[in-house]
UniProtKB/Swiss-Prot annotation:
Is required not only for elongation of protein synthesis but also for the initiation of all mRNA translation through initiator tRNA(fMet) aminoacylation. Its main location: cytoplasm. A motif ('HIGH' region) lies at residues 10-20. Binds 1 zinc ion per subunit. The gene is metG. It comes from Nanoarchaeum equitans (strain Kin4-M). Homodimer. Residues 676-776 form the tRNA-binding domain. This is Methionine--tRNA ligase. The lineage of its organism: Archaea, Nanobdellota, Candidatus Nanoarchaeia, Nanoarchaeales, Nanoarchaeaceae.
Amino acid sequence: MRILVTAALPYSNGPIHLGHIAGAYLPADIFYRFVKLKGYNALYICGSDQYGSPIELNAIKLNIDPKDYASFYRKIQEEIFKKFNIKFDIYSGTAESNIHPIIVKEFFLSLFSAGLLIEKEQELPYDPKIKRFLPDRFVVGQCPYCGYEKAYGDQCEKCGRLLEPKELINPKSAITGEKVIFKKTRHLFFNIPKLKDKLKQYIESKKDVWNDFTYSWSLALLDNFKERAITRDNKWGVKVPAKEMLEILKKALKEGKTPKDFGLLIDSTNEKDLENHIKEYENKVLYVWFDAPIGYISFTFETSPEYRYYWDEKEKPYIVHFIGKDNIPFHTIFWPALIIGRNLGYKNINHILDFDIALPYQVFGNPYLNYYGKKFSKSKRWGVFLDNIDKIDIDIDYFRFYLAYIHTVSKDMSFEWDQFKEVINKELVDNIGNFIHRVLTFIYNRFNGIPPKIEHLDDKDKELLDKIKQLPEKVFNFIWKGEIGNALREIVNTSNLANKYFQEKEPWKTNDPNTIAIAFEAVKTFIILLYPFIPEKAKLLASIANIDIKWDFNQKVEKINKPFIVFHKLSDNQIEMAKQILTNPKEYDLGKKKVIGVLRYEDELYKIELECDDNPWVCLKRELDKRKIKYIYDTVKGDVPPHIIDGNTYIYLLPALEKPNLEKAEEEYGLVSYLDFAKLDMRVGKIIDVQDHPNADKLYIIKVSLGNKQKTLVGGLKQYYKKEELIGKYVVLINNLKPKQLRGITSEGMLLAADDGKEVALLMPDKPISLGSKVR
């Protein structure tokens, strides 16, 4: 029996966050680890979805190649998965795989040869300046409903109304700003309704396999599924195989068929007419939602031809998809329709997959993970973002445990820091961790590390032992149904019973080997079953218990190793620091950056503005040196952190040694009045914690106590002070400074310091004074 586990392909338009992990990748990872543990022949497949309009549009805006843009984020996504210990056998990308376009074209040509495509004429927006059709998202204009000036061609983001490009008032190209015209074009549509009977038969066969929601929703939606376009006028994507289409058409015409049999809008059978008709498709690409799921197959085949058996229908593989609940119809109707259609037509064309492809066995559509009940939003900085997950002092297995513990199959979940801390400290540390550590320590100290054997059983012994023996299959049955949370909670509940048993038996009084022997059976079982949830911690526990991580709960252990504490409680400080780092998504530098240098000479300010592709400081320094402008920072080696970062704008404030030949800076950089100065609320504080900034080599994240509250600051002190030199110092800070994002971390104030261009010295009270005292 072969099991192929897949997780939804993340779109490589940005990093993934904790909601993505909880919705597909962690449940799939846990499921995969369990089936491997059980001894099944299994693969876990994933990769980035790298084509489509959003990627193309963003790349154009940044003046970079779409492939570079998509590859950049694919690497970031893969790194985040690695940090979260998501163990794929293969992680690829639709634009990285050499075989992917070949298999995608095979699917397309199979549908074409089977008569499952329909040609339709549409009138779509066109940019005459660059001579290309525009996807809906490439068109902007005034919303006809609310008047918003920057509504997209598919939706107004202000009022939320769904739109058509033609509805916009004064529609313009998002690429050039040119007024768009509407021009006729032809596209091919997948005739899904033609396969309705076969799809209904397939869905009905899953009545006892899929959960009730997935089954009933898919069946209800089937009647409303219409033809869907599978070609687009984009540049970025898998090219439509127009030449092969024409060859299939010519061959079929010789067999007595007509263009109408292929759904084409042409009556002529003249070879030249057909060539001209099909030629239009040479400049089109296949729709991203058509090519993306085929990536499951492409990525499997990247490793070795033997992996074909995970897709060959004759082999009866178990193909299991993990996705978000919004993706259910796509995987229960559209994707099976593609497979059915491909199987009907592939023998009529040149193909590399010489077998019928198996339909999905199981589709797990998981609920969403919200953040305090609300949807994740990068722009609003609302959620838990994973770019810097390795920069915090919390073990990844703690996040894995918590997300699995709160997992449900019926309603949306919510990540909350207080609950996270409570679940870890109560269930993982105090319950499971404490029980395992107590038993192992007891064996090591009282029995010289040699686990005793079971001699006799009383009723309490039998009760616990029976539950322990039944636990593996109970847990696996939950896992097989995609009920990850129920599986883990079953382990937690059984651990509670084991703790109660241990307390009631009081082996520290009796030194009863029988009690310890039964408790050790529980320990071995817990460790093995916890491995898919918390693999690194489970491996540590297994090394102490001297057992192998395998589906064998009766392993004989001659002697255990010296125990050590594996689980530690989470502190408030750990939570606060993690919250600061993980609720601030990292900003990535793609494309041009705006750099502003503000130079002060005597009482005047001057500025220079640049657009740079490389390091902002290097770019500014290069231009200042080129203009022979003398400034104090010319003695500083290496990168200099900007004083202000605002999106993709970097501002440097530099003292000039002579009057620079630059334009005067605007008033916002100029002198302030006494009344403006009086607005500053300066207070005495004490530095209580210092951490390295995860996104900047020369910045610290500094915790300052004001007595009745604490503040988090970001300061460029790393080259002037060691961490230990700062902790405990009394300092002066601006308390009412507007919070500012500095390289992804919110700074809630500013420390006062003197700077002569070579050295920096913090301003500190010269004698003891109460924390929070006002500086006047």
